[in-house]
Swiss-Prot record:
CDD domains: ASKHA_NBD_HSP70_DnaK-like. This is Chaperone protein DnaK. The keyword Protein transport does not apply. Acts as a chaperone. SUPFAM superfamilies: Actin-like ATPase domain, Heat shock protein 70kD (HSP70), C-terminal subdomain, Heat shock protein 70kD (HSP70), peptide-binding domain. Residues 597-620 are annotated as: Disordered. InterPro entries: ATPase_NBD, Chaperone_DnaK, Heat_shock_70_CS, HSP70_C_sf, HSP70_peptide-bd_sf, Hsp_70_fam. HAMAP family: DnaK. The lineage of its organism: Bacteria, Pseudomonadati, Campylobacterota, Epsilonproteobacteria, Campylobacterales. The gene is dnaK.
Amino acid sequence: MGKVIGIDLGTTNSAMAVYEGNEAKIIANKEGKNTTPSIVAFTDKGEILVGESAKRQAVTNPEKTIYSIKRIMGLMFNEDKAKEAEKRLPYKIVDRNGACAIEISGKVYTPQEISAKILMKLKEDAESYLGESVTEAVITVPAYFNDSQRKATKEAGTIAGLNVLRIINEPTSAALAYGLDKKESEKIMVYDLGGGTFDVTVLETGDNVVEVLATGGDAFLGGDDFDNRVIDFLASEFKSETGIEIKNDVMALQRLKEAAENAKKELSSAMETEINLPFITADATGPKHLVKKLTRAKFESLTEDLVEETISKIESVIKDAGLTKNEISEVVMVGGSTRIPKVQERVKAFINKDLNKSVNPDEVVAVGASIQGGVLKGDVKDVLLLDVTPLSLGIETLGGVMTKVIDRGTTIPAKKSQVFSTAEDNQPAVSIMVLQGERELARDNKSLGKFDLQGIAPAPRGVPQIEVTFDIDANGILTVSAQDKNTGKSQEIKISGSSGLSDSEIEKMVKDAELHKEEDARKKEVIEARNHADSLAHQTQKSLDEHKTNLNENDANEIQNAINALKECVKNDNATKAELEDKTKLLAQAAQKLGEAMANKNNAEQPKKKDDDVIDAEVE
């Protein structure tokens, strides 16, 4: 029998799991992460991006990046919740046969179609992980979802090519994941605070039965709302300091949104964090930077009413269940936003019991869904997933060439260094452009980041030794460092999620590399010929200036003319490899007389031999 995957189709993030080997296991997506952003983006080139790739480009494409589609799933256009969604969501919500839909570039999409694109990615990633076709799934929904919302969720699964065996409630699924169905009869509360929704449910468990006694929730209360409080605070502070209303700039607002989310996460473990957004906007006086410290105490004061609203919901649901707080025997915390310390503190204080946090709150619902799938279909074999670098990593060197440091397919963790040098005499700094891809030219690869190494001691080009080190740890965090071996000065950049690409992009880049292999090789040969010519012209000019008095006028003029001709050829972007090599050969022949004159006078200086470990690819 085929495997059944359990899917938590979340407002902000989605997750999937499979029941195998008598246990439920989370399935990592192709990016190596256990959760996938529930985001779909439409690019100007006609591409459709889903998940991490969609989230990454949200800053530059906010109007065509769809998130929180679950909030309008199965809603009629005239419902109050739909009107509330219109106020909060940046994309256009329209009426399609009385139901909510969205409009992107003049085309209308239903929430089911958008959700199906997320489910299709999950399905494809699960198939990649399991090594077989996946056609069946158990999908979870909030306990307060009505029939039309549940039907819409199932329709999304059908569009994605999945036979949805069961739609089950998220709190029921969470209870299964915690193994609460195996305990003696007791009453538990599931507190589920996700990225976009809040759900609190009281259940009675026992004799392998999980029964919902009462449930409540808010389709518009979640981690996003906590982020919005931080955004409003930062925007207000920025306006008071600069007079600029940053929220009117959609790209700046998206950067602010991402920074607020990161700050919220950091404050779950730290007491203070710094939001640093350089060049966030500009006015007549020049570029503006947003730098602000945010303490946990300030964050808690900004979001206090949101936390208290969840406590009010708890009180109502317990009352609806016909129980008192003292009759609740266990509290299960679900959803990524339950990591917020104040949330845990208030729930614990209200119920007066320790919280059950034994399973990852981001994964627990998907785990429970997979258990339900296991109940329906049975156990399956174990599968192991290994992580490797999906594409080569390197830096841009002289002439716009990508010089690889770590090759594609390298098992991580991995660390490798190469030594480069400068491109100009007395060059005080080098710029390190970190690249990812398989193409020969830097411009054809993905740029991951850039940093400068300052303070290089004055020296002729080719003499300084700059050691560049690529270090990928077991978490996939890439750190690139550069050190001047002479002065000891160093600089580094840390790049999270070194892939930086969707799988479709990875596949396209590998195919492009194969398709353009010969063309790229020819371009690289021209660049190498140009670099060699430039170096010869530079060195010969230097020697001629120093030893011109040892030559007769005709020989000196012949050499100078050959130098000038080669320099002009180097400057010509359309010069071919043959033309560059011909001019280089002519200069080399003319320069023989200079070498003879220098030898005859016995004052020639032998050029310092390069270190064998130094790569003959200079950094600009």
